[in-house]
Design a protein with these regions (language model features):
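HIT superfamily nucleotide-processing domains
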Residues: 1-113
Length: 113
């Protein structure tokens, strides 16, 4: 999509600190980190929500989830990490291109709203 921030990053139109890239995904440093280590794993196909993905996009998300553990050392995830996929504005989604937050580098608690 021409107005999507992540599509522009994928296309190289907007700079980002790339940690990994292949034909299915790009992993970048978050510009507004919520943890010591905060990365975004972004599938290269544009869709907003898990409920919207087709089979090809579902395979792409699966490949993202399988790739993240292989990058533990490079991303500083060795002591544990959290994956978050926000679904919709009320859940905290601010860029409406599905992406996986990868958070690590500190002990994380859990305080439900």
């Amino acid at each position: 999509m021409s107005d999507c921030l992540f599509c522009k990053i994928i296309a190289g139109e907007i700079p980002a600190t790339k940690m990994y890239e292949d034909e299915n995904m790009i992993i970048i440093k978050d510009i507004d980190p919520k943890a010591k280590n905060h990365f975004l794993c972004i599938p290269k196909s544009h869709f907003k929500l898990l409920a919207e993905m087709d089979e090809t996009q579902a395979e792409m998300v699966k490949k993202c989830l399988k790739k993240i553990p292989t990058l533990e050392k490079e991303l500083g995830l060795s002591n544990g990490y959290r994956l978050v996929i926000n679904q919709g504005e009320d859940a905290g989604q601010t860029v409406f291109h599905l992406h996986i937050h990868i958070l690590s580098g500190q002990k994380m608690g859990w305080t439900p709203a």
